[in-house]
Amino acid sequence: MIVSATTVKKVLREEPLGPAGKRKGPSWREFLRAHAKSVIAVDFFTVDTVWLQRLYVLFFIEFESRRVRLAGCTAHPDERWVTQQARQVAWTLAAHEEPVRFLIRDRDWKFTPSFDAVFRADGIRVIRTPIRAPQANAVAERFVRTIRQECLDWLLIMNAGHLERTLQMFFDHYNRVSYCPTRLCA
């Protein structure tokens, strides 16, 4: 089907659509500010040990408070492991006073359909960020930068147990100290 430019122009005049930048509806930033209490983000980052073993760390971060939860770390994040971590986090989120409604994640292959199903079963809508758009999950990406700069770049990690102890100490510190640079946390 071929549509001429004149037809497109005519339809756009008849319909109340403005230019792309001026259409109605909230921007991504406005959406996040309005729903900050009910949004969490999830992401992975990797850490290489001194024995050249790559470990994958799964974490969740709340948008409003910037509170971070360590889900776990493993050398092999297969479907079974990732789904089990999702179950454990979903169980703790059920005790939240403010219900979580949205989970933002990237399109990493490690996030399997069963991972998403755990959250959908609890009524949490899973929002996948656009391809190659790390800014869409900026809160999680910024946390990865923070933990690398303030902790992991200064240490030689021996194994998974050493990494988990280190991360738990950093997460406890991070959750006690106010790192939130925005007014969302106020």
Which residues does each PLM region occupy?
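Charged DNA-binding/catalytic regions of mobile-element recombinases
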Residues: 1-186
